[in-house]
């Protein structure tokens, strides 16, 4: 009984008594004990902190059963029914830094091994809690907004609901125990459904009614033509999220994944890190572990190499069709295209980057030389072997991680210096003894990897991207002149990027679809990743 999970990270009734009520188990009142007694059946569904209504109904039922079975008197039962419960204040767990915590655990374990869990280590990190929460919310909001525009795939499951209202609540709680809430994305059991209205029960015990625009994402599931596996009917387990006006919207768990990371370009200190949509569902950290094609977000590094070779922002390059036969490519013939399929002829370098013109990028790389551009990219922290010296490098056909991209864009942000990302600043043991103390290094000339003039011109070029180019939504939102960045979409439209910076922060948002479908239309200005990047 002292090993059973009872919610709120409590294992066993002794721990639950302390966590929920802040007292030893022997000091619990009948009402408090009844509340804990209801937890084993469904710790999440009957958690009084998260689901007070459902938990209270369960508690009241248990008190009544205790009286009926002679464990307490009528007077004790009446008093227990009336007693208001006061819970111990819960620690704030709203930062949502699960990926940060796991990354820290891995870093510490690599240094201290098995002692990581036995020495009571206290680890201080560079992450800012407010930045972390904003990043978490923004990424999830962007992915959920995208998912609402996709074809509805159907309910997560179906459950047979009893006709007797007395048994209904327990059946709902049992069903939702296998489909826990995902933060703001709530699991719900449908009680009644029609094309105009859906009534469903949440894990908290609350009943919600969804109508109008809240049904649009699941319209196909409410159609008479819906198949048995996609139809929303009584007993269907669906997902609901609150809209900006507080109204409920039916949706589904995203199939797309994403990541966000921001660092201080002056020091390399990581300020926020979100490795995916849901750590509980997928612990793979896409910020540090996902090697993906950067697409057009890699073009600035090709342009930077061109500046070193004598190009300027006013250099004219022809945006005209290109064709490479098998002899030139060493494999298959290649006829690259611009995203919009249009060619605009001779244009300035700054216009070409703002419009993300593929033909110009390829011609620039031809002039610079693929070997030189590959070596130049390593100055920003990229791995040469992941960026083969071919012309496809101009379109971002290599492999990067979001953390690499944030670090690389920091070079432009800080005037040409390379900083190494850092997460841990201080470690002490359970006796308070200092084991590690790392202060962010001051940027100096020993860290310079590109000329300050190169970084300055690149910042001006990337400012044109956010002012009037593929990332113009950034300027339209903030009306600030100190925001610079570049969008990126891979040729197969499976990955979408936005990398941007201002003098004190560099950030990267990446979104991708692992399913065999295009993530977005082949438009480098797509609105999918920009909302998360703007926030």
Residue locations for each model-derived region?
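Beta-strand segments within the central parallel beta-sheet cores of soluble alpha/beta enzyme folds
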Residues: 1, 78-81, 316-322, 378, ...
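Non-catalytic, structured segments within soluble enzyme domains
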Residues: 1-201, 364-367, 378-379, 383-384, ...
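Glycine-rich, acidic and aromatic/proline-enriched surface loops and short helix-turn segments
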Residues: 2, 6-9, 26, 30-42, ...
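Conserved catalytic neighborhood of penicillin-recognizing serine enzymes
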Residues: 26, 93-96, 266, 311-373, ...
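Short beta-alpha connecting loops at secondary-structure transitions
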Residues: 47, 285-289, 332-341, 390-393, ...
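Active-site SXXK
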Residues: 66, 135, 195, 267-268, ...
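A penicillin-recognizing enzyme superfamily signal
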Residues: 125, 129-132, 136-138, 167-171, ...
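Mid-domain, small-residue-enriched loop/turn segments at the edges of structured enzyme/sensor domains
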Residues: 331-336, 369-407, 423
């Amino acid at each position: 009984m002292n090993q059973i999970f009872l919610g709120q990270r409590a294992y066993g009734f002794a721990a639950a008594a302390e966590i929920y009520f802040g007292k030893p188990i022997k000091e619990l009142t009948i009402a408090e004990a009844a509340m804990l007694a209801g937890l084993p059946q469904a710790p999440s569904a009957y958690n009084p902190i998260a689901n007070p209504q459902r938990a209270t109904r369960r508690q009241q039922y248990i008190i009544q059963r205790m009286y009926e079975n002679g464990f307490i008197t009528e007077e004790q039962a009446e008093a227990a029914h009336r007693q208001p419960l006061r819970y111990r204040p819960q620690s704030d767990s709203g930062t949502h830094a699960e990926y940060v915590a796991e990354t820290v655990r891995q870093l510490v374990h690599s240094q201290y091994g098995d002692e990581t869990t036995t020495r009571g280590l206290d680890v201080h990190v560079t992450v800012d809690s407010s930045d972390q929460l904003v990043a978490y919310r923004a990424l999830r909001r962007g992915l959920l907004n995208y998912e609402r525009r996709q074809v509805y795939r159907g309910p997560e499951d179906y459950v047979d609901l009893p006709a007797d209202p007395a048994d209904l609540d327990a059946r709902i709680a049992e069903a939702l125990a296998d489909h826990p809430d995902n933060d703001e994305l709530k699991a719900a059991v449908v009680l009644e459904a029609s094309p105009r209205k859906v009534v469903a029960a949440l894990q908290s015990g609350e009943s919600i009614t969804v109508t109008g625009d809240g049904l649009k994402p699941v319209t196909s599931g409410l159609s008479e033509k819906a198949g048995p596996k996609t139809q929303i009917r009584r007993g269907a387990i669906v997902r609901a999220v609150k809209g900006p006006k507080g109204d409920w919207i039916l949706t589904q768990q995203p199939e797309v994944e994403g990541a966000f990371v921001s660092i201080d370009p002056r020091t390399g200190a990581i300020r926020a890190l979100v490795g995916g949509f849901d750590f509980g569902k997928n612990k793979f950290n896409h910020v540090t572990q996902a090697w993906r094609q950067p697409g057009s977000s890699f073009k600035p590094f090709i342009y930077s190499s061109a500046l070193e070779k004598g190009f300027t922002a006013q250099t004219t390059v022809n945006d005209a069709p290109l064709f490479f036969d098998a002899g030139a490519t060493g494999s298959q013939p290649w006829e690259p295209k611009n995203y919009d399929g249009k060619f605009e002829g001779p244009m300035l370098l700054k216009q070409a980057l703002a419009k993300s013109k593929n033909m110009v990028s390829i011609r620039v790389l031809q002039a610079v030389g693929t070997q030189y551009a590959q070596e130049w990219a390593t100055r920003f922290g990229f791995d040469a072997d992941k960026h083969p010296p071919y012309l496809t490098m101009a379109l971002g056909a290599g492999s990067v991680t979001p953390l690499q991209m944030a670090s690389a864009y920091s070079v432009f942000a800080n005037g040409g210096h390379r900083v190494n990302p850092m997460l841990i600043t201080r470690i002490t043991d359970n006796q308070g003894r200092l084991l590690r103390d790392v202060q962010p290094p001051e940027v100096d000339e020993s860290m310079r990897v590109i000329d300050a003039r190169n970084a300055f011109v690149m910042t001006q070029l990337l400012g044109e991207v956010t002012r009037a180019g593929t990332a113009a939504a950034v300027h339209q939102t903030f009306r600030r002149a100190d925001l610079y960045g570049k969008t990126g979409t891979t040729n197969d439209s499976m990955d979408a990027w936005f990398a941007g910076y201002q003098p004190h922060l560099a950030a990267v948002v990446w979104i991708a679809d692992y399913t065999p479908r295009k993530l977005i239309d082949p438009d480098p200005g797509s609105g999918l990743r920009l909302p998360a990047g703007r926030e």
